[in-house]
Amino acid sequence: MAEAKALPRFKKLYQDNIRKALLEEFKYDNEMQIPRITKVVLNMGVGEATGDSKKPAVAAEDLAMIAGQKAVVTRARNSIATFKLREGMPIGAKVTLRQDRMYEFLDRLITIALPRVRDFRGLNPKSFDGRGNYAMGIKEHIVFPEINYDKVDQIWGMDIIVCTTAKTDDEARSLLRAFNFPFRQ
Protein backbone atom coordinates (compact mmCIF):
# COMPACT_ATOMS: atom_id res chain seq x y z
CA MET A 1 0.00 0.00 0.00
CA ALA A 2 1.34 3.43 -0.95
CA GLU A 3 2.10 5.85 1.86
CA ALA A 4 0.26 9.17 1.89
CA LYS A 5 2.54 12.13 1.19
CA ALA A 6 2.80 14.69 3.95
CA LEU A 7 1.13 17.99 3.13
CA PRO A 8 3.59 20.93 3.14
CA ARG A 9 3.16 23.17 6.19
CA PHE A 10 2.36 26.32 4.18
CA LYS A 11 -0.16 24.50 1.97
CA LYS A 12 -1.97 23.23 5.07
CA LEU A 13 -1.85 26.75 6.57
CA TYR A 14 -3.40 28.15 3.37
CA GLN A 15 -6.16 25.54 3.17
CA ASP A 16 -7.09 25.65 6.86
CA ASN A 17 -6.65 29.29 7.91
CA ILE A 18 -5.70 31.75 5.17
CA ARG A 19 -8.58 30.98 2.77
CA LYS A 20 -11.16 31.61 5.50
CA ALA A 21 -9.46 34.82 6.64
CA LEU A 22 -9.28 36.22 3.08
CA LEU A 23 -12.91 35.25 2.41
CA GLU A 24 -14.00 37.23 5.49
CA GLU A 25 -11.70 40.18 4.77
CA PHE A 26 -12.64 40.74 1.11
CA LYS A 27 -16.20 39.26 1.12
CA TYR A 28 -15.84 37.20 -2.07
CA ASP A 29 -18.98 35.79 -3.71
CA ASN A 30 -17.25 32.65 -4.93
CA GLU A 31 -14.53 30.53 -3.31
CA MET A 32 -12.57 30.49 -6.57
CA GLN A 33 -12.08 34.26 -6.23
CA ILE A 34 -9.91 33.78 -3.15
CA PRO A 35 -6.33 34.62 -4.18
CA ARG A 36 -3.71 31.88 -4.12
CA ILE A 37 -0.05 31.60 -5.01
CA THR A 38 0.32 30.00 -8.44
CA LYS A 39 4.09 29.85 -8.86
CA VAL A 40 7.44 31.09 -7.60
CA VAL A 41 10.16 31.90 -10.13
CA LEU A 42 13.80 31.99 -9.03
CA ASN A 43 16.21 33.76 -11.36
CA MET A 44 19.97 34.09 -11.03
CA GLY A 45 21.70 36.43 -13.48
CA VAL A 46 25.43 35.85 -13.80
CA GLY A 47 27.00 39.11 -14.96
CA GLU A 48 30.49 37.69 -15.48
CA ALA A 49 29.20 34.99 -17.83
CA THR A 50 30.67 36.70 -20.91
CA GLY A 51 34.19 35.87 -19.75
CA ASP A 52 33.53 32.34 -18.47
CA SER A 53 30.76 30.21 -19.95
CA LYS A 54 30.98 27.68 -17.07
CA LYS A 55 29.64 30.16 -14.49
CA PRO A 56 25.97 29.89 -15.56
CA ALA A 57 26.22 26.10 -15.22
CA VAL A 58 27.59 26.47 -11.67
CA ALA A 59 24.82 28.98 -10.90
CA ALA A 60 22.26 26.49 -12.26
CA GLU A 61 23.63 23.78 -9.94
CA ASP A 62 23.37 26.08 -6.92
CA LEU A 63 19.86 27.13 -7.93
CA ALA A 64 18.86 23.47 -8.34
CA MET A 65 20.11 22.75 -4.81
CA ILE A 66 18.11 25.69 -3.42
CA ALA A 67 14.91 24.88 -5.34
CA GLY A 68 15.03 21.08 -5.21
CA GLN A 69 14.40 20.88 -8.94
CA LYS A 70 16.59 21.20 -12.04
CA ALA A 71 17.32 24.76 -13.18
CA VAL A 72 17.36 25.92 -16.80
CA VAL A 73 20.33 27.90 -18.14
CA THR A 74 19.03 31.15 -19.65
CA ARG A 75 20.55 32.55 -22.83
CA ALA A 76 20.89 36.08 -24.22
CA ARG A 77 18.03 37.07 -26.54
CA ASN A 78 20.07 39.58 -28.51
CA SER A 79 23.64 40.81 -28.84
CA ILE A 80 24.90 43.84 -26.91
CA ALA A 81 28.34 44.95 -28.06
CA THR A 82 29.13 47.15 -25.04
CA PHE A 83 28.75 44.12 -22.72
CA LYS A 84 30.58 41.80 -25.17
CA LEU A 85 27.42 39.73 -25.26
CA ARG A 86 26.38 37.59 -28.23
CA GLU A 87 22.94 36.21 -28.96
CA GLY A 88 22.51 32.73 -27.49
CA MET A 89 25.31 33.03 -24.90
CA PRO A 90 24.47 31.56 -21.46
CA ILE A 91 23.91 34.44 -19.00
CA GLY A 92 22.13 32.93 -16.00
CA ALA A 93 19.75 30.30 -14.66
CA LYS A 94 16.10 30.12 -13.63
CA VAL A 95 13.66 27.67 -12.13
CA THR A 96 9.86 27.77 -11.78
CA LEU A 97 8.32 26.14 -8.70
CA ARG A 98 4.68 25.10 -8.47
CA GLN A 99 2.47 23.08 -6.09
CA ASP A 100 4.18 21.35 -3.13
CA ARG A 101 7.76 22.40 -4.00
CA MET A 102 6.62 26.02 -4.16
CA TYR A 103 5.10 25.88 -0.65
CA GLU A 104 8.16 24.09 0.75
CA PHE A 105 10.48 26.71 -0.78
CA LEU A 106 8.41 29.61 0.61
CA ASP A 107 8.50 27.97 4.04
CA ARG A 108 12.31 27.72 3.92
CA LEU A 109 12.61 31.26 2.53
CA ILE A 110 10.54 32.90 5.26
CA THR A 111 11.57 30.82 8.28
CA ILE A 112 15.26 30.15 7.52
CA ALA A 113 16.75 32.21 4.67
CA LEU A 114 15.38 35.73 5.23
CA PRO A 115 16.37 35.84 8.93
CA ARG A 116 19.93 34.96 7.84
CA VAL A 117 20.18 37.96 5.47
CA ARG A 118 22.64 40.52 6.77
CA ASP A 119 21.05 43.84 7.93
CA PHE A 120 17.55 42.57 7.09
CA ARG A 121 14.89 45.12 7.99
CA GLY A 122 11.93 43.56 6.22
CA LEU A 123 10.67 43.19 2.67
CA ASN A 124 9.72 46.25 0.64
CA PRO A 125 5.90 46.50 0.70
CA LYS A 126 5.91 48.47 -2.59
CA SER A 127 7.46 45.74 -4.76
CA PHE A 128 4.10 44.63 -6.16
CA ASP A 129 3.55 44.99 -9.91
CA GLY A 130 -0.06 46.25 -9.84
CA ARG A 131 -1.50 42.85 -10.77
CA GLY A 132 -0.90 41.02 -7.50
CA ASN A 133 2.59 39.63 -8.13
CA TYR A 134 5.50 40.29 -5.78
CA ALA A 135 9.19 40.52 -6.68
CA MET A 136 12.15 40.62 -4.32
CA GLY A 137 15.89 40.31 -4.59
CA ILE A 138 18.46 38.62 -2.40
CA LYS A 139 22.08 39.80 -2.64
CA GLU A 140 23.69 36.56 -1.42
CA HIS A 141 22.48 33.08 -2.35
CA ILE A 142 24.43 31.58 0.57
CA VAL A 143 21.63 32.45 3.03
CA PHE A 144 19.91 29.20 2.02
CA PRO A 145 20.89 26.19 4.17
CA GLU A 146 21.27 23.93 1.10
CA ILE A 147 24.35 25.87 -0.03
CA ASN A 148 27.61 24.83 1.64
CA TYR A 149 29.46 28.09 2.31
CA ASP A 150 32.90 26.43 2.17
CA LYS A 151 32.38 25.00 -1.33
CA VAL A 152 31.07 28.23 -2.89
CA ASP A 153 33.64 29.94 -5.11
CA GLN A 154 31.46 32.97 -5.88
CA ILE A 155 28.44 34.59 -4.24
CA TRP A 156 25.55 35.54 -6.54
CA GLY A 157 22.34 37.43 -6.00
CA MET A 158 18.96 36.17 -7.08
CA ASP A 159 15.48 37.40 -7.93
CA ILE A 160 12.40 35.75 -6.42
CA ILE A 161 9.02 36.42 -8.05
CA VAL A 162 5.85 35.23 -6.30
CA CYS A 163 2.92 35.03 -8.76
CA THR A 164 -0.61 35.08 -7.35
CA THR A 165 -4.16 35.05 -8.70
CA ALA A 166 -4.95 38.25 -6.77
CA LYS A 167 -6.50 41.02 -8.86
CA THR A 168 -5.07 43.90 -6.80
CA ASP A 169 -1.93 44.57 -4.80
CA ASP A 170 -3.94 44.89 -1.57
CA GLU A 171 -5.33 41.37 -1.97
CA ALA A 172 -1.85 40.01 -2.73
CA ARG A 173 -0.36 41.90 0.24
CA SER A 174 -2.98 40.38 2.56
CA LEU A 175 -2.30 36.92 1.13
CA LEU A 176 1.46 37.17 1.59
CA ARG A 177 1.12 38.79 5.02
CA ALA A 178 -1.00 35.79 6.04
CA PHE A 179 1.94 33.58 4.98
CA ASN A 180 4.09 35.62 7.44
CA PHE A 181 6.08 37.52 4.80
CA PRO A 182 8.04 40.06 6.90
CA PHE A 183 7.05 43.34 5.22
CA ARG A 184 8.64 46.59 6.37
CA GLN A 185 6.25 48.88 8.26
Swiss-Prot record:
Coiled-coil regions, chain positions: none
Q: Which cysteines are joined by disulfide bonds?
A: none
Q: Name one GO molecular function term.
A: structural constituent of ribosome
Pfam families associated with the record: Ribosomal_L5 (PF00281), Ribosomal_L5_C (PF00673)
Identify the domain of life.
Bacteria
| A cellular-component GO term for this protein | ribonucleoprotein complex
Keyword Magnesium attributed: no
Q: Which GO terms describe its biological process?
A: translation
* Listed InterPro entries: Ribosomal_uL5 (IPR002132), Ribosomal_uL5_bac-type (IPR020930), Ribosomal_uL5_C (IPR031309), Ribosomal_uL5_CS (IPR020929), Ribosomal_uL5_dom_sf (IPR022803), Ribosomal_uL5_N (IPR031310)
Q: Which UniProt keywords apply?
A: Ribonucleoprotein, Ribosomal protein, RNA-binding, rRNA-binding, tRNA-binding
Q: Which Gene3D superfamilies match?
A: 3.30.1440.10
Subunit arrangement? Part of the 50S ribosomal subunit; part of the 5S rRNA/L5/L18/L25 subcomplex. Contacts the 5S rRNA and the P site tRNA. Forms a bridge to the 30S subunit in the 70S ribosome.
Q: What PANTHER family is this protein classified in?
A: 60S RIBOSOMAL PROTEIN L11-RELATED
Summarizing the function annotation, the protein's role is: This is one of the proteins that bind and probably mediate the attachment of the 5S RNA into the large ribosomal subunit, where it forms part of the central protuberance. In the 70S ribosome it contacts protein S13 of the 30S subunit (bridge B1b), connecting the 2 subunits; this bridge is implicated in subunit movement. Contacts the P site tRNA; the 5S rRNA and some of its associated proteins might help stabilize positioning of ribosome-bound tRNAs.
Q: According to its UniProt record, which protein family does this protein belong to?
A: Belongs to the universal ribosomal protein uL5 family.
Q: Which HAMAP family match?
A: Ribosomal_uL5_B
Q: What is this protein called?
A: Large ribosomal subunit protein uL5
Give the organism the record lists: Brucella canis (strain ATCC 23365 / NCTC 10854 / RM-666)
